[in-house]
Amino acid sequence: MMAAISAAEHGADVVLFEKNDRFGKKLRITGKGRCNLTNDCDQKEFLGNVPTNPRFLYAALSGFSTEDTKSFFENLGVPLKTERGKRVFPVSDKAQDIVHAMERHCRDCGVQMIREKVKSVVIRDGIAVGIQTESQALEADAVIVCTGGLSYPTTGSDGDGYRFARAAGHRVTELQPSLIPLVAEGKLCASMQGLSLKNVSLRMVDCETGKCVYEDFGEMLFTHYGLSGPMVLSASAHLKDITPGKYQAQIDLKPALDEKKLDARLLSDFAKYQNKDFANSLGDLLPQKMIEPFIRLCEIDPRKKVNSITREERERIVRQMKRLCVEIRGVRPISEAIITRGGVDVKEISPKTMESKLVSGLYFAGEVLDLDAYTGGFNLQIAFSTAYAAGEAAACQTPRTENQ
């Protein structure tokens, strides 16, 4: 929709095709239905959150910045707010407000909106001249492909854009899931299924090199298959070629306390509960759902009285609290990823216009390109910026008739 709006605002006659039963289906579920539409940071910080081809985005971000995105939606009557991590949301916390505003603006700009699947892009003599749908052929001076990647295929992102790109002679880099939950070895995570942790630290360690590849403080979630939550999704973007045994998640349950202070806290709690079983002495330090599996990790009899806990056992408890280790086996299916890593090779795309360097009049924007970023509104901003650039450039194609 952003590409259609941009093209229409720059004077083009625009036809927008959507194969789903409604427009903005994927946008409606972003940010757990709240729509984290951008990040209120400067360009340097923004590009620091783009691990794949950040330099390609300089021109697009300069042409339609995070400030431009905020102004765009506020001018459409959607008040915004900024939360922790500079994440920008609609005040209503409803993604549908963003979708409805864009739909209204499309119609106000004269965009013809058609719900029909596009089967192919028609190319003649190296020029995009239209599209073929299931029921009609439409001539056009420019075609913009904004089909998304492979994540959330039920929203329509099932790889059509990659098929169009390959048919046009473009290289599509390896497609992998990113911003995706992690699958763990063993039954530890399943035993704590549904438990959400806040104010913990997470380190992801490459077991082959011993190097920490990701570290952050925040929230995470144990699931029946492994780990999820904001930090885990962000961590997944830093992991390459995930195989069993390659990565280990290390969770610091008490990051505000060093080992000495945590030991002192344990001694204080043990004095408080000196006549209780070990299993009944950890309630002030750990969530109830974690206590039983945690005790198993410590290899201490849960019925042992706390006044009988040895110094060596106490050290074992402290070590587990400061470094709870989870071996990573893999990731969830790409259909569960927030975004797709990989896509149309940006070396074959003009960074200023998003036009194909191989086919005149053919443009690509958004997740279909080999661009991905961390969580925090960065990926939607990439979609908005590249779509705006593509729409503006497509509107300048001459002679001008209809643009998709």
PLM-predicted stretches and their roles:
Residues 28-60:
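N-terminal glycine-rich dinucleotide-binding loop that anchors FAD/FMN and/or NAD(P) in oxidoreductases
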Residues 149-168, 370-399:
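A conserved FAD-binding loop/helix module that cradles the flavin
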Residues 114-120, 292-372:
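A glycine-rich dinucleotide-binding beta-alpha-beta segment and adjacent secondary-structure elements
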Residues 15-17, 118, 131, 138-157, ...:
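Short hydrophobic core segments
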Residues 60-142, 291:
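Feature captures the FAD/FMN-dependent oxidoreductase FAD-binding
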Residues 21-29, 37, 43-44, 79, ...:
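An anion/pyrophosphate-binding glycine-rich loop and adjacent beta-alpha core
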Residues 1-16, 384-395:
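N-terminal Rossmann-like FAD-binding beta1-loop-alpha1 element of flavoenzymes
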Residues 8-32:
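Glycine-rich FAD pyrophosphate-binding loop
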